[in-house]
Amino acid sequence: LAPWTSDTGNPVELLVLDHKTLSTGESWLKVLLPSRPNGATAWIRESNVILRKNPMRVEISLRRHELRVFRRGHVVLTIGVALGAAATPTPKGRFAIYQKIREVWWSPLGPWALHLTAHSNVLFEYAGGPGRVAIHGARGVLWAAAGTNPSHGCIRVPDPGIRKVVPLVSPGTPVDIVA
């Protein structure tokens, strides 16, 4: 695992799932990896990383077509979203934000894309990438009404909504995609 993301060159920030201290006193962290299969984990030495607490969490309800942002367990933002089509469903599980990418003004992904550690369960390549799932804006050909299922697995948020989400979250923020 490289210390920098390949797309942005920013430091990698991973979600810590567990912590163990060995009898030798050495501490290890179980982290969620941004690779296949979904849910892949690894143990890394705590002494090799900088830890920070993150009070935020994102939950995406597939049934309600809703993205909610929580701060210390309290909902601070709720937005309707469009999700994956039947043939390319949005995967369920515990993930994390891997990268925050500011898109160019003309991008159909809207102003921001929040790449997740999640990957499509059916697409192993998409648009030249590894089939990574993202929370992103929606304009032009990708615009879709909340409550619909037109995407290749990504979570499409209206542009005004993604602008509200972005300042609340950071790489490493947990993202739970639930039924």
Model-derived features with residue positions:
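Boundary regions of SH3-family modules and the immediately adjacent low-complexity/disordered segments
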Residues: 32-60, 71, 77, 83
